Amino acid sequence: SAYYRLQAANDWGNPLNLESSINALLFGYDFGPYYRAGGVSIGLKMETRKVRHEVKAFAESHWADEKNTNVSLANLLGRSDPPPNMQADEITIAGLAGRLRLQAGVDPDALVTTGTIWGEAGVGDVQYARLAIGATATVPLFWRLGGSLEWSAGTTFGDVPTQRLYYVAGPQTVRSFEANQITGEAFWLVRTEMAVGYPIFRLVAFGDFGSAGELSELGSADPFVAVGGGVSLLDGLLRADLARGVHGAGPLRWQFLLYLDALM
């Protein structure tokens, strides 16, 4: 396929979908950051109940794209403007990208685990590679109580452009922080959730822990931490959270999030 599009630097979720647009319109924040990309790609996807994989070859150019509006309900009510878009490096590259996801268990009343590995390599104006792994476990406990644990980690190699760093903030990573507040050449992430109720309606409490930066300094860096609670409807199909950053560099704030297809 050929394309000329706004592209998200985020590895998690889909920042260009409906839920991101709703949060931007109501609350003035997004799940980006974004850059402009134009090029061609060809790929292959396969999905079964237990295995999902995709691989693609691409050739594309990247450049920065300015934010065009600050309009939101929160902005009209006096909230400050959202941060500017990222300053992406202007490059032309060709490369390969792929993702493999394995799942064990499908019964929501039993242990369900997943494992994912994803990576990318590019050559051209810059030469770089990215590699990350992650896993999740969701388990029912007792008295309609359930829990989930998610972890992931990744690193990069070579001359990584700004738009291919890791951005570890948002509803799928560390909630309540700005999209460009936790970024670096390597990262780690741990998320825990506890929920009580029935699939149609659950109350949820959560904690997010993560950090990003240079690999050599990642182990000694203070993590970013957020905690909060929320409501899950229809087994996570619709989710509303109130999150609070409690530790990390930069401003700590409350954030209300609406999103779809949550883990619990």
Language-model features, listed with the residues they occupy:
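Conserved active-site loop/cleft motifs that coordinate metal ions or position small ligands
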Residues: 203-206, 238-243
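A short, acidic, flexible beta-alpha connecting loop/helix-capping segment that sits on the rim
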Residues: 244-249
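C-terminal outer-membrane beta-barrel translocator/porin domains of Gram-negative envelope proteins
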Residues: 1-45, 72-217, 261
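Outer-membrane beta-barrel "beta-signal"
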Residues: 229-237, 252-264
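A short alpha/beta connector and helix-capping loop motif
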Residues: 217-231
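Aromatic- and glycine-enriched pocket-lining scaffold segments that form the walls
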Residues: 42-70
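One face of beta-strands
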Residues: 55, 131-135, 205, 225-229, ...
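A generic beta-sheet turn/junction motif
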Residues: 48-50, 196-200, 233-235
